[in-house]
Amino acid sequence: MSDLTPAEIVIELDKYIVGQAKAKRSVAIALRNRWRRRQVPEAMREEIAPKNIILIGPTGVGKTEIARRLARLTDSPFLKIEASKFTEVGYVGRDVESMVRDLVELTVTHLKVSEREAVREKAVRLAEERILDVLLPRPEGPQRADGDEPLGSHIEIVSDDDGRVSTREKLRTMLRAGKLKDRYVDLELADRSMPMVEIFSNSGLEEMGVNFKDMFAGLLPKNKKRRKVKVPEALEMLTDEEAQNLVDMDRVVRMAVEKVEQSGIIFLDEIDKIVATSKGSGPDVSREGVQRDLLPIVEGSTVMTKHGAVKTDHILFIASGAFHMCKPSDLIPELQGRFPIRVELDALGKEEFFRILIEPENALLLQYIELLRTEGVDVAFADEAVREIAAMAEEVNAGTENIGARRLHTLMEYLLEDLLFDAPDRAGTKVAIDRAYVTDRLKTIRGNEDLSRFIL
């Protein structure tokens, strides 16, 4: 889906996120520009840098949801991480370069899975042959051509070549038909596990870009693990092993690094949490240090990973923050300049809450309806009941902390608490939820401001 037009991207986001048209347009253009850059001549391609985006808006308006949906929408390497996890170099915690390492590791894993799926058909055929070798050893004796011993319960050896081939084909037919599912076989599988070693755990081995598995691969003996399992499980295990052997990991790593460098996207959530809220010494100094550590990564630098050097020049960074205790201008000026596109997301009111409850795919009301249906309880919400829930969410947000659409989750739990508890005893019943039901269940919150503060 990497060649979606901006309009198509917005349509996809509209299925899950209500409103926020400006934010959707900005991320849609940024995604499309990734595709456009790949189409220009190579000499110009290196000069086109991504325009990083910062999404500004109160909590619960859809910033993080946009990131979640983008991750599913694009086939580009995508990582969402909270900026508050990072600490300045020299402090206990993770340094900012670890997000690039995480993105590379994630991409390698995804590519490895897709490559294994591509060779799965061949791996299944090879696994079948290995199972048949176990069930029907070769007439030369117990030694296989590759030197491994075929272990386990097996069929009596047939000396005649034609008879042996015929027996092998009969076994293959039975194997594919599932007639051998209750037979046990003994297997020898490569033991790919590594001994648990914890060295310098506070600094984190991944921070050094060291792959201890590769370092010890030539030193540790290649052990084999012997297991007795049923034929279907044996076939699955052998298929995984054969697929692993068929995948060229050097090629996968090269593809992953190139993909990260050319089309990687990092979503930095809660970037406002690394803004210094006051002048002076203390933890805020470390926060400013994190911002300064971010500068070279966002602008473009080389990060060492266990898979090699990775350039960040063309990685797209999308940051988001509520900025309710600070302003975007409180970021250090150098970092502000690295995010040229700023989008302010709108606060949500009762009309948006009403749409959130019913419009998106797998909307919140539909989730509760389906959950209760599993117990045999058929729930129906009247239109005025939904509007009352939306109005209540707006009212509680205005009277306490404004947490946006997240208020709907807590109100729905409070509204349906008794029904969710008693559902197993009400199988086969129908429940109609109207405005009076909503008003009655939520009247204590509306009438008691102190209580409403606890409805987070």
Swiss-Prot record:
Transmembrane intervals: none
Entry keyword Mitochondrion: no
Binding site for ATP: 18, 60-65, 269, 334, 406
GO function terms (MF aspect): ATP binding; ATP hydrolysis activity; peptidase activity; proteasome-activating activity
InterPro entries: AAA+_ATPase, ATP-dep_Clp_protease_ClpX, ATPase_AAA_core, Clp_ATPase_C, HslU, P-loop_NTPase
Subcellular location: Cytoplasm
GO cellular component: HslUV protease complex
Predominant subcellular localization, coarse grouping: cytoplasm
Gene3D superfamilies, per database record: 1.10.8.60, P-loop containing nucleotide triphosphate hydrolases
A GO BP entry: protein unfolding
Domain of life: Bacteria
Keywords: ATP-binding, Chaperone, Cytoplasm, Nucleotide-binding, Stress response
Keyword Signal carried by entry: no
Annotated NCBIfam families: hslU, PRK05201.1
Family: Belongs to the ClpX chaperone family. HslU subfamily.
Quaternary structure and partners: A double ring-shaped homohexamer of HslV is capped on each side by a ring-shaped HslU homohexamer. The assembly of the HslU/HslV complex is dependent on binding of ATP.
Function, as annotated: ATPase subunit of a proteasome-like degradation complex; this subunit has chaperone activity. The binding of ATP and its subsequent hydrolysis by HslU are essential for unfolding of protein substrates subsequently hydrolyzed by HslV. HslU recognizes the N-terminal part of its protein substrates and unfolds these before they are guided to HslV for hydrolysis.
HAMAP family: HslU
Name of the protein in question: ATP-dependent protease ATPase subunit HslU
